[in-house]
Swiss-Prot record:
Lineage: Viruses, Riboviria, Orthornavirae, Negarnaviricota, Haploviricotina
Role this protein plays: Plays a major role in antagonizing the type I IFN-mediated antiviral response by degrading or inhibiting multiple cellular factors required for either IFN induction or response pathways. Acts cooperatively with NS2 to repress activation and nuclear translocation of host IFN-regulatory factor IRF3. Also disrupts the association of IRF3 with CREBBP. Interacts with host mitochondrial-associated membrane (MAM) MAVS and prevents the interaction with RIGI. Interacts with TRIM25 to suppress TRIM25-mediated RIGI ubiquitination and thereby RIGI-MAVS interaction.
Domain of life (superkingdom): Viruses
Protein's GO biological process: symbiont-mediated perturbation of host apoptosis; symbiont-mediated suppression of host adaptive immune response; symbiont-mediated suppression of host cytoplasmic pattern recognition receptor signaling pathway via inhibition of IRF3 activity; symbiont-mediated suppression of host cytoplasmic pattern recognition receptor signaling pathway via inhibition of IRF7 activity; symbiont-mediated suppression of host cytoplasmic pattern recognition receptor signaling pathway via inhibition of MAVS activity; symbiont-mediated suppression of host cytoplasmic pattern recognition receptor signaling pathway via inhibition of RIG-I activity; symbiont-mediated suppression of host cytoplasmic pattern recognition receptor signaling pathway via inhibition of TBK1 activity; symbiont-mediated suppression of host JAK-STAT cascade via inhibition of STAT2 activity
InterPro entries assigned to the protein according to its UniProt record, in alphabetical order: Pneumo_NS1 (IPR005099)
Name of the gene this protein is made from: 1C
Predominant place of localization: host cell
Native source species: Human respiratory syncytial virus B (strain 18537)
One cellular component (GO) term of this entry: host cell nucleus
Subcellular location field: Host cytoplasm; Host mitochondrion; Host nucleus
Protein biosynthesis is among the record's keywords: no
Sequence motif: DLNP, positions: 136-139
Protein name, per record: Non-structural protein 1
Keywords: Host cytoplasm, Host mitochondrion, Host nucleus, Host-virus interaction, Inhibition of host adaptive immune response by virus, Inhibition of host innate immune response by virus, Inhibition of host interferon signaling pathway by virus, Inhibition of host IRF3 by virus, Inhibition of host IRF7 by virus, Inhibition of host MAVS by virus, Inhibition of host RIG-I by virus, Inhibition of host RLR pathway by virus, Inhibition of host STAT2 by virus, Inhibition of host TBK1 by virus, Inhibition of host TLR pathway by virus, Interferon antiviral system evasion, Modulation of host cell apoptosis by virus, Viral immunoevasion
Keyword NAD (UniProt): no
Family: Belongs to the pneumovirus non-structural protein 1 family.
């Protein structure tokens, strides 16, 4: 059995509702799949969404491995990525403990990803996003 190793990335998040504001987010993840960490997630997509007044973050990958520090993401966080080729969407993590009174996220906010969403939960979430953004993600 391999031991769990800590992997960390820092991502500058564009605020969904004010393009002039950014926040620095620290993401940590424990995994024993060390070999896969080096390259499996080079094309991961990290983005935020606000549902019912609560900000969430998720990571979409083509691997079941956690994000690692080889990922440098510069992305438009207002765009909903479409899952293709068996990609995974990681469990949504609520960021209320990272929010400031002005609505922005605290610098170095720490998030842990532990599991991916089930197919039924993912479908429900995608439908919510579709309704929220006025998109048909099933076409």
């Amino acid at each position: 059995m391999g031991c769990n190793s800590l992997s960390m990335i820092k991502v500058r998040l564009q605020n969904l509702f004010d393009n002039d504001e950014v926040a620095l987010l620290k993401i940590t993840c424990y995994t024993d799949k060390l070999i896969l960490l080096t390259n499996a997630l080079a094309k991961a997509v990290i983005h935020t969404i606000k549902l019912n007044g609560i900000v969430f973050i998720h990571v979409i990958t083509s691997s079941e491995v956690c994000p690692d520090n080889n990922i440098v993401v510069k992305s438009n966080f207002t765009t909903m990525p479409i899952l293709q080729n068996g990609g995974y969407i990681w469990e949504l993590i609520e960021l209320t403990h990272c929010s400031q009174s002005n609505g922005l996220m605290v610098d170095n906010c720490e998030i842990k990803f532990s599991k991916r969403l089930s197919d039924s939960v993912m479908t429900n979430y995608m439908n919510q996003i579709s309704d929220l953004l006025g998109l048909d993600l099933n076409s």
